[in-house]
Amino acid sequence: MVIIGILMSKERIKKTALEIVKYIHGNIKACNIPNQKKENKFFAPLVYLCQTECDKILSNTKISLLERLLKCAKIIGDLQSGNCMQQTFLAFQRLLMRLIEDKLSNFSTCIPISVMTISNHAFLIIDNDIVCDPWLNFVGDLKDYCFANMKRKEYFGIRSDWTCFTNSEVYDEDS
C-alpha cells in the first residue's frame, strides 16, 4: 500500500511540475533559444534587465538564499523574462507553493527540491529523481533527461526535513 501511495505522489508531483513548466515555457521569454535569432535579439534587453535585478538580489547576503530566490522569482514573474537559471528560480518558487497547497509538503516534511546546475544550464531535481526543466520544456525521470550523465552541482536545495543547503554540503541556517 505504501508503494502505491509513493507512486501516486510521484505522478502528482510530475503533473504539477508539468503545469508549471508549460506556463513558464510559454510565458517567460528567454534570449538564448536556438534557431530564434530575431526573437532572441528582441527579448535580450528585457532578459538582461531581469538578470541584472536578480544579480542584485542574489548579492544581498544579509538575507537567506531561500529569500533571495523567492524575491528573484517575483521579479522574473513581473518582468516575464529570464534564461534557464531565472526560469528555474520561478519553477522552484511555484513548485514549492503548489506542493504545500496540494498537501504533498507540510510543516514537518517537504518533498526535496534542488536547484541544480551543469556548466551553463540550470534545472530542478524534485524528490531526488524527477527533473523539472522549464527552459527545455521537460518534466520526467532523471534517467531520461538529456543531461542525466553530466556532473551536476547543487546551487540550493531543501531536504525532506526542510533543512536548506547551498552547494550540496553547506547548511544554510538562515533559510
Model-derived regions: residue spans:
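A structural boundary/capping signal
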Residues: 1-175
